[in-house]
């Protein structure tokens, strides 16, 4: 509030005297003191009244508002905005009045777009557009041969319009009509690959004249956030990077003009404006303001979380996405479906605040919504209605109904206008709104509507305004942004560093766990190589070389988790980069620098553990130098994996490239293949491998030590002789050259990381693929909607009753938290029940408890099905549960998903023909016929849209013929028409006599009144109403109207919105009643208890439902169905299977080239070591890649498995056996690739026996590593921990493979680990089958020995043990597969 000086003092005096504090003179003197201070101080100084947590105010005093602590800010906002509905409007009015009093014009933006066309290019394939292995290969070949077909799809088709300031515009339209594309285009965020024509301007300025990404904000449909950060931290960082815009300059100007005019502002408004204008601070008052108006205060300090980590709810995450954008100074907002997952009351509150912001702050706002309630719809000033990429109507909201009445269509009474608008343009729903009875109805196309609008007064006025050039002289450039970044380079670097450090603290468990594993592996290594260096001869020098290589390999593999961690954050980085929060270098530098202490610690721990115990040269200087090399190598390796993640970004592809990098670095590192043994034309590989420089540095540090200075017969020191044999003798000075090279590699990889983040395209959805056949068909299917769900399969109608249900969990702080409090009710056959309440009331929790899905917590109360205590196995068979989150196998089609569900959930006495008929009927009922051959895909990346995925979730449950169906928010994410389709089907299902319960958030009038009964809940899991709705919701309205002070329901308003509004916490406080207690004391509650008891007694008269088995199908049918699904999933997953086949081919080719024909001539031990090195390379690295890539594939399907297992679709053994068997054909193919490429190129001996052994050993290797990767997934809670354990497994199987330390030299206390390591048996079988029967004499370490004797003496391999090796090799995959099957059935990491 602003006023004259006297009024201002009087206001402040009244405000303070009520609390017994300052008088007028003291306040005036304080204000005068502020005005006398320098400008830079005055702008951060205000008269601030501190408050305690009880709300008690202290004396108002002069304070620096930039130094307010968290409690001060929170209590200040709580005092300013006690009730969001009213107080936010008052606050904005006071701010606007203060601005107006000094004559400042607020900057504003008018966004115009004219003849805007947007086209996308898609790939045309013959047959179904399914990404199979064959399609992937043929697509790559066709692109290579430039013969691929491409088709352009028009997304926006010549749209024009004006988004005006001080007004809020609603964007409506059916799915795929171009709403998101229009929002992206107007905000300057369209993908560059899209072809755009037309003009877009802000205040007459084209996008090339300013920075649109900083002038406007786009609120995405996708909730991308860093899961480790809290809600407050997410908003603080967003606010910090966005800066304060013109707030600071405006506050300075207001202060200057007020001083000249002698105006004393409201102290609280002055403090708020100054605190919100502070730049570069870690926290800002604006964060607390946004938390308050979005209703996020309750979870402000809760971490965001994700699928594998607990966090905030989906609705809270949606609000956080909105808050992240509006916390900054930008006033032009393009918001995409911001109400998904929110109840209608919360949506109304948020949009009310946005409306107040638009009108009082002159903001420009365009919002797309799916199902706006009538009250929410009326908040908007203007409306844009879209269809088929065109704008049908663009004008004032008030005139849209009259426009369509002129076209012959009228919105019925008690029909949501938004719902009417989306259905009237649909061919399938249009006819019901035809109002010209005297005329025969004929379908009015979208083109006809557009033509009529263009000829209307509104259309002509719009064209007239667009034809006039915007007068730039009227433009306030403060509204446009001409800088990419709000902060200085140094401030951006500090902010990114602060966030990176915080994330490292939040992930401290991962780093501690990783360091613990490193200590564990280090302990094993030092005891395996115990005092190896104490004997100085060429043989022990070879062992010492093995220990050095193992150290290097361990630190190399230790960097792999950095790859997965980086990929997991790439999506959030890309979003924030597009928003111009910061440049890539500001993100890359802290990522690199703050990991230096981790590298330092892990390298030091390894060196400290192993150096003196293994027996390296004991000088302290050499200890430090070895540590420095390992430190530099570790830095370069984690930098390399970061760079790979930034370049490739896809999990499977990046993991495969990471594995290839390990292969290349290891093979060219100078140990597996000696430098002299490399082909001369491939020696460049040696000089490009960081591992070779580390090898040079470590060996120079060790073998130029005095203790290796003994002169040999060749007149060289023993150390030089050892280095010469390996081709590593580059002189003593080579150590520092190697160290410098490793630092250079670190800098190079970090530069690549930064450049990749800067210049490579942002991660996006996969390229659209369409079928050639479908492309020739009409896009509109005229099939009728099934008016009835005609499924006539027999089922048992069941009553579900529950009494005094309580659910209590223990918080991390050890406190008891009650989420459900004495909930009592009944779900009856043929009755459609709605479960409603504000976000966080416990609706989903109640469904989870009643259905038996909770995995922790204490459940009390009585739950009965059919009058008998619920038996979970039986209940899972006869019930269906549509989860809030749509979890499906990504590589099946829509029809196959339904077929799979019907196959396993319908009993075996139902014929296949009947099952197919049911599947087709459900496809028709839920309107999935047109997309039945579409791949489900991964949410946000490929496949179905959100609303299609939601309909699939419902369809999958319907085909199971359940007696009881629970649906958790079945209409969330659907537009009004799709929601109506779904609810029509649900209503028809209930009318067949089934028991149906749905939780709902923001239903339209029609959807809400389709329900028969309502259970209304409040926070704390308490029921405040349970009973019938009545015609036009009369019963529930009558119940709440009895409460004194409840406002009447306005005519044509949505009863659901009204109910949520009057039962909100703030409304309850105003009324001064406890609605839950009022319900428990009501006559309705007593009547309900009697009805529930009668229902129980009636049900008890019937027979108890007993099923003959836990599953609908036999074990054999379960296995067949699971194998069918897994086969399709694998065949359609080229990113997994094609990638690992390519990797195997690459590794084999590399080995073939490096070891060309080396197996033919074996004359000394080094020749044998070369051949053994080729075997070791293929075995270890092909295994590593298979293990790494299978993790993500199995982890994706694990969530689907949890859902399907709960529904008793199959036994875990049937699922796991199918998962195990489906890997075999791909492993067979990889093994064949190995034999075809490696065998002739390396020059192995040709015989059926030897070829078979090579094939058999590699085949078992691949299965072992595949099954171990699958086992890792099922015994760990998330992929990140699985990846960390994986790298330690690689180190162990490397150490005990018999390559870096042969079996005879392994200490007896570790020999059992040799026998437990699968790689030791594989290498035994490969080498012994090739050379175990060879009697040729070779020179081995100065002695002549037969090859077979050398194998036994040096490696411990015996030819007569091959039969045992063969048995053990097949036993390993069988054991691992059995463990996988056991643990996937026993462990459940899904916390509910």
Curated annotation (Swiss-Prot):
Membrane-protein topology: Multi-pass membrane protein
Q: In which tissues is it expressed?
A: Confined to shoots.
The record's annotation in Pfam families points to: ABC2_membrane, ABC2_membrane_7, ABC_tran, PDR_assoc
The GO molecular function terms of this record are:
ABC-type transporter activity; ATP binding; ATP hydrolysis activity
Tell me where in or outside the cell this protein is found. Membrane
Q: Which UniProt keywords apply?
A: ATP-binding, Membrane, Nucleotide-binding, Repeat, Transmembrane, Transmembrane helix, Transport
From start to end residue, where is composition biased (Polar residues)?
1-18
Taxonomic superkingdom: Eukaryota
One GO cellular-component annotation of the UniProt record comes to: plasma membrane
Q: What are the binding positions for ATP 1 in this chain? A: 173-180
Q: List residues traversing the bilayer.
A: 509-529, 543-563, 596-616, 627-647, 652-672, 739-759, 1136-1156, 1175-1195, 1215-1237, 1255-1275, 1281-1301, 1309-1329, 1364-1384
Which part of the chain is the ABC transporter domain? 139-413, 800-1045
Which residues lie within the region annotated Disordered? 1-26
Record's SUPFAM superfamilies? P-loop containing nucleoside triphosphate hydrolases
**What's the main place this protein lives?**
membrane
- UniProt: ATP 2 binding residues: 837-844
The protein's job, in short, is: May be a general defense protein.
Q: What is stated as this protein's family in its record?
A: Belongs to the ABC transporter superfamily. ABCG family. PDR (TC 3.A.1.205) subfamily.
> What is the protein named?
ABC transporter G family member 42
């Amino acid at each position: 509030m602003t006023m004259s000086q006297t009024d201002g003092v009087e206001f402040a005096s009244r405000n303070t005297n009520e609390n017994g504090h300052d008088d007028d003179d003291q306040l005036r003197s304080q204000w005068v003191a502020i005005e006398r201070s320098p400008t830079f101080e005055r702008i951060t100084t205000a008269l601030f009244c501190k408050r305690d947590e009880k709300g008690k105010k202290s004396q108002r005093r002069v304070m620096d508002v930039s130094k307010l602590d968290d409690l001060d800010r929170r209590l200040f906002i709580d005092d300013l905005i006690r009730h969001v509905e009213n107080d936010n409007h008052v606050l904005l009015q006071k701010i606007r009045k203060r601005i107006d009093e000094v004559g400042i014009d607020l900057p504003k933006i008018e966004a115009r777009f004219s003849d805007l066309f947007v086209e996308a290019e898609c790939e045309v394939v013959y047959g179904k557009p399914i990404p199979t292995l064959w399609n992937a290969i043929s697509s790559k070949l066709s692109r290579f041969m430039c013969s691929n077909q491409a088709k352009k799809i028009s997304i926006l088709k010549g749209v024009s319009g004006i988004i005006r300031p001080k007004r809020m515009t609603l964007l409506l339209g059916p799915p795929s009509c171009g709403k998101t594309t229009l929002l992206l285009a107007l905000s300057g965020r369209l993908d560059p690959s899209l072809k755009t024509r037309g003009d877009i301007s802000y205040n007459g300025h084209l996008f090339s004249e300013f920075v649109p990404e900083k002038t406007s904000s786009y609120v995405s449909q996708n909730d991308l956030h860093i899961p480790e950060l809290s809600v407050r931290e997410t908003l603080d960082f967003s606010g910090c990077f966005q800066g304060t815009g013109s707030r600071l300059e405006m506050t300075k100007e207001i202060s200057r003009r007020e001083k000249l005019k002698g105006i004393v502002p409201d102290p609280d408004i002055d403090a708020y404006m100054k605190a919100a204008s502070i730049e570069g601070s870690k926290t800002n008052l604006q964060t607390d303001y946004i938390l308050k108006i979005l209703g996020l205060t309750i979870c402000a300090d809760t971490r965001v979380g994700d699928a594998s980590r607990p966090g905030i709810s989906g609705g809270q995450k949606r609000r956080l996405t909105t808050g992240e954008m509006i916390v900054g100074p930008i006033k032009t907002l393009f918001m995409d479906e911001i109400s998904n997952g929110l109840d209608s009351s919360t949506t109304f509150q948020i949009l009310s605040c946005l409306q107040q912001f638009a009108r009082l702050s002159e903001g420009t706002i365009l919002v797309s919504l799916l199902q706006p309630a009538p009250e929410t719809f009326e908040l908007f000033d203007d409306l844009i209605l879209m269809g088929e990429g065109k704008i049908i109507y663009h004008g004032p909201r008030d005139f849209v109904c009259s426009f369509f009445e002129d076209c012959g269509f009228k919105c019925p009474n008690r029909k949501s206008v938004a719902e009417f608008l989306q259905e009237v343009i649909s061919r399938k729903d249009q006819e019901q709104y035809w109002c010209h009875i005297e005329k025969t109805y004929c379908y009015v196309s979208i083109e006809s509507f557009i033509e009529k609008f263009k000829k209307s007064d509104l259309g002509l006025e719009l064209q007239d305004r667009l034809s006039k050039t915007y007068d730039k002289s009227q433009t306030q450039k403060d509204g446009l942004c001409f800088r990419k970044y709000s902060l200085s380079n140094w401030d951006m670097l500090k902010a990114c560093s602060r966030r990176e450090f915080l994330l490292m603290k939040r992930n401290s468990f991962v780093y501690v766990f990783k360091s613990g594993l490193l200590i564990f592996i280090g302990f094993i290594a030092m005891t395996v190589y115990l005092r190896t260096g104490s004997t100085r001869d060429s043989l022990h020098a070879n062992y010492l070389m093995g220990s050095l290589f193992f150290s290097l390999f361990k630190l190399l593999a230790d960097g792999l988790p950095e790859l997965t961690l980086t990929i997991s954050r790439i999506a959030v980085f890309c979003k924030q980069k597009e928003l111009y929060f910061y440049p890539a270098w500001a993100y890359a530098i802290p990522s690199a620098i703050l990991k230096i202490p981790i590298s330092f610690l892990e390298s030091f721990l390894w060196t400290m553990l192993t150096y003196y115990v293994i027996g390296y040269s004991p000088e302290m200087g050499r200890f430090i130098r070895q540590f420095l090399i390992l430190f530099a190598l570790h830095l370069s390796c984690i930098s390399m994996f970061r760079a790979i993640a930034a370049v490739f970004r896809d999990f499977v592809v990046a993991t495969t490239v990471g594995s290839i990098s390990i292969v290349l670095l290891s093979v060219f590192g100078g140990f597996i293949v000696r430098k002299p043994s490399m082909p001369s034309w491939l020696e460049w590989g040696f000089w490009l491998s960081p591992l070779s420089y580390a090898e040079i540095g470590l060996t120079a540090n060790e073998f130029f030590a005095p203790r290796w200075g003994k002169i040999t017969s060749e007149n060289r020191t023993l150390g030089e002789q050892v280095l010469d044999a390996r081709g590593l003798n580059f002189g003593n000075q080579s150590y520092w050259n190697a160290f410098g090279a490793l630092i250079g590699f670190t800098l190079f990889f970090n530069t690549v990381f930064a450049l990749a983040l800067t210049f490579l395209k942002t991660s996006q959805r996969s390229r659209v693929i369409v079928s050639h056949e479908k492309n020739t068909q009409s896009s509109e299917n005229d099939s009728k909607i099934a008016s009835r769900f005609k499924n006539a399969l027999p089922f048992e109608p069941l009553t579900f009753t529950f009494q005094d249900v309580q659910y209590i969990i223990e918080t991390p702080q050890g406190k008891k938290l009650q989420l459900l409090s004495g909930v009592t009710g009944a779900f009856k056959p043929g009755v459609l029940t709605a479960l409603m309440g504000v976000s966080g009331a416990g609706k989903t929790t109640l469904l989870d408890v009643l259905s038996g899905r909770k995995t922790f917590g204490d459940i009390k109360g009585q739950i009965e099905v059919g009058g008998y205590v619920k038996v979970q196995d039986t209940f899972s068979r006869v019930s269906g549960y549509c989860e809030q989150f749509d979890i499906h196998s990504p590589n099946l089609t829509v029809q196959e998903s339904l077929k799979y569900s019907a196959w396993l959930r319908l009993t075996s006495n139902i014929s296949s023909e009947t099952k197919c008929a049911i599947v087709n009927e459900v496809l028709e009922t839920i309107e999935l016929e047109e997309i039945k051959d579409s791949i489900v895909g991964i949410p946000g990346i490929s496949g179905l849209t959100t609303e299609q995925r939601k309909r699939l979730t419902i369809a999958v449950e319907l085909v199971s013929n359940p007696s009881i169906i629970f649906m958790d928010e079945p209409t969330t994410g659907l537009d009004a028409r799709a929601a109506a389709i779904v609810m029509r089907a649900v209503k028809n299902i209930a009318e067949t006599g089934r028991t149906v319960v749905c939780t709902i958030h923001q239903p339209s009038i029609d959807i809400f009144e389709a329900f028969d009964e309502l259970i209304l809940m409040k926070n704390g899991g308490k029921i405040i109403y349970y009973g019938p709705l009545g015609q036009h919701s009369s019963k529930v309205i009558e119940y709440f109207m009895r409460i004194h002070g409840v406002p009447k329901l306005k005519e044509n308003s949505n009863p659901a919105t009204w109910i949520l509004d009057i039962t909100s916490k703030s409304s309850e406080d105003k009324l001064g009643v406890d609605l839950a207690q009022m319900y428990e004391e009501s006559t309705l509650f007593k009547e309900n208890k009697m009805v529930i008891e009668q229902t129980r007694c009636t049900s008890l008269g019937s027979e108890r439902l007993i099923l003959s088995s836990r599953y609908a199908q036999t074990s054999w049918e379960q296995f067949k169905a699971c194998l069918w699904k897994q086969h399709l999933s694998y065949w359609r997953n080229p990113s997994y299977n094609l990638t690992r086949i390519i990797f195997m081919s690459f590794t084999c080719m590399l080995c073939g080239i490096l070891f060309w024909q080396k197996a033919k001539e074996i004359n000394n031990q080094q020749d044998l070591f070369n051949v053994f090195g080729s075997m070791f390379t293929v075995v270890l690295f092909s295994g590593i890649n298979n293990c790494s890539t299978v993790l993500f594939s199995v982890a994706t399907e694990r969530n689907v498995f949890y859902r399907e297992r709960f529904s008793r679709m199959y036994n875990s053994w049937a699922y796991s056996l199918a998962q195990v068997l489906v890997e075999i054909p791909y492993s067979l193919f990889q093994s064949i690739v190995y034999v075809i490429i490696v065998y002739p190129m390396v020059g192995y001996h040709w015989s059926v026996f030897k070829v078979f052994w090579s094939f058999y050993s590699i085949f078992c290797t691949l299965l072992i590593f595949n099954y171990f990767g699958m086992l890792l997934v099922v015994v760990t809670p998330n992929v990140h921990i699985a990846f960390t354990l994986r790298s330690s497994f690689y180190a162990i199987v490397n150490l005990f493979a018999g390559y870096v330390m042969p079996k005879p030299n392994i200490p007896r206390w570790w020999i059992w680990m040799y026998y437990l390591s699968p790689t030791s048996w594989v290498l035994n079988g490969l080498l012994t089958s090739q050379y175990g029967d060879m009697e040729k004499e070779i020179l081995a370490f100065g002695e002549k020995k037969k090859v077979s004797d050398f194998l036994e003496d040096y490696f411990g391999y015996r030819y007569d043990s091959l039969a045992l090796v063969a048995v053990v090799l097949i036993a390993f995959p069988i054991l691992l597969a059995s463990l996988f099957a056991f643990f996937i059935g026993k462990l459940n990491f899904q916390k509910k």
